[in-house]
Structures are given as C-alpha cells and as structure tokens.
C-alpha cells in the first residue's frame, strides 16, 4: 500500500512540475516550427515574411534559391486597428 502511495505522489509531482513553454503563443510556435524568427516591424534583406507573430511582429525566414521550402502563410487573429477618418 505504501508503494502505491509513493508512486502516486511521484506521478503527481512529475505532472505538476513538468516544463511548460507558456511564453510563446500558438502563432510564435508555428513560426519557430517553420524555422522562422519573429522580428519587430521589418524583416532583413535576405528574409521573406511568412506571416505575423503579434501586433507589430512579423515571422521572417531566410530564403534560399538552392533549397526551396514551401511556406504556408501564417494568419494571425490580430487585426490592425482602424485609423480615424479625418473630416
């Protein structure tokens, strides 16, 4: 009985103390899975924009002519705020 209790407690601690990457959102994780980098405002000259990470962050990935890799466009839930119309 004590062995079962000990195993149950160890399993509980393993579940509760498991490493969790909570700092990345789903779009940032998808960008990293495509070998991309989230950059602020603009991508470098040798990079293509393959999506959006956050408000002003863009998912950028280096393009290589010799090794083309298809990249799906990453759509973000964020929409730019409407600009006020001047009357």
UniProtKB/Swiss-Prot annotation:
The residue range of the signal peptide is 1-22
What SUPFAM superfamilies does the annotation carry?
Defensin-like
- Which cysteines does the record link by disulfide bonds? 31-59, 38-53, 43-60
Alphabetical list of InterPro entries matching this protein = Beta/alpha-defensin_C
Localisation: Secreted
Q: Which residues are glycosylated?
A: 33
Keywords attached to this Swiss-Prot or TrEMBL record, sorted alphabetically, are: Disulfide bond, Glycoprotein, Secreted, Signal
Function of the protein:
Has antibacterial activity.
PANTHER family, per this entry?
A: BETA-DEFENSIN, BETA-DEFENSIN 109B-RELATED
Protein family membership: Belongs to the beta-defensin family.
| Protein name, UniProt field | Beta-defensin 109D
Name the species this protein comes from.
Homo sapiens
Give the taxonomic lineage as stored in the record: Eukaryota, Metazoa, Chordata, Craniata, Vertebrata
